[in-house]
Amino acid sequence: MLNTKKFAIAIVAIAAVVGACSSTTATATTGSGASSGASSAAVGSVALLLPENHTARYEAADKPFFTTKFNSVCSGVTLNYQNAAESEATQLSQAEAAITAGATVLVLDPVNGATATAIMSAASAKNVKVISYDRLITAPNSTPDWYISFDNEKVGELQGTALLAKLNSMNLGHTPNVLWINGSPKDNNATLFKQGAHTALDGKVTIVKEDAMANWLQSEAQTLMDGWITSVGATGFDGVYVANDGGAAGVYASEVAHGVDPKTKPMTGQDAALDAVQRIVMGTQYMTVYKKVQTEAEAAAELACAMVKGSTAVPSDLTASVSAAGVNNGTASIKSILLTPLAVTIDGSNGTQTVEATIVADQFYGANTVSQICDAKVDAGLPAACTAAGVK
């Protein structure tokens, strides 16, 4: 089985280069003199509050990319970073502490956007601005100032469309049978992924089983698959919709443990985790959705810097991504910056992109992206598979 922690390890080098703090309770400052001439005390500070550390991207990508960009554009302004480790109570305490310490802007990726009312109330009471980062805050009567994310319903559509195309190409002779694993119900993004995938697949496949990872854990996906394979057998399904790469790792492990060849059961993913891309190269995972987390994190850092200095204008390099209609969070239409996700497969078929043209071209895991993907220490077959796939 491929190492499911490789993505986090791969980007440690990036984190080191950008000088990000490794502690989930660290406070970073952004340099010695404010280019605007304003002191940190005069403009307040910014708090970056991320939801969990089960998914590798938050500590390995969002945090360092945000921190580096913030350092470069907001010199002299204090940045307070916290990770809630999937605890709503912890995140509330972190937000309240940040506000007490002088934060005037919260960049909040909520553990549970539907129950973030107390955080939003605390921010509102002190006139603190809130950027809803990656996950939309949908708590009743909550109106974050901005929402920055990807088009998350589009993510699900990309997953579903790619899976359907692959299943149809297999000439099964029957309507494809699909096992379906959604993301955490606490995460509004997971709801949007699910909606998009159902839009692409409903009426075109038979959904044999459908459930969700309660906390986005690989082990949760593996447990679901263990039960389902026992129930329906290896011939009872043709493919697997999985909301993210962590879940795909669990599906892969379950299939291998039950003697099911993953190459014969195409599955989806999301996040371009290193082990997932290695599975794609080896043919044991069909696709992933590549989201340029660096772009998302840097956009949030730029906007937070502008807001902490009192600007209401969108930084000029972000205007093209502003959604004209905004995104409705159930209370109001929230001003939104929505970025474009990409479907990635080994061959770029059916409207997808190749690993080489996206993840390699962007050096997503650092300057040694190719050597990490094609590491023979992970799987002796990877170098040859990379060569065959044009990953170089």
Model regions and ranges:
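Bacterial N-terminal signal peptides that target proteins for export
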Residues: 1-11
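C-terminal motif of bacterial Sec signal peptides marking the signal peptidase cleavage site
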Residues: 15-20
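A residue-level marker of the well-folded mature domains of exported/periplasmic proteins
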Residues: 2-4, 22-392
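A periodicity- and composition-biased signal for non-globular, repetitive helical segments
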Residues: 11-12, 97
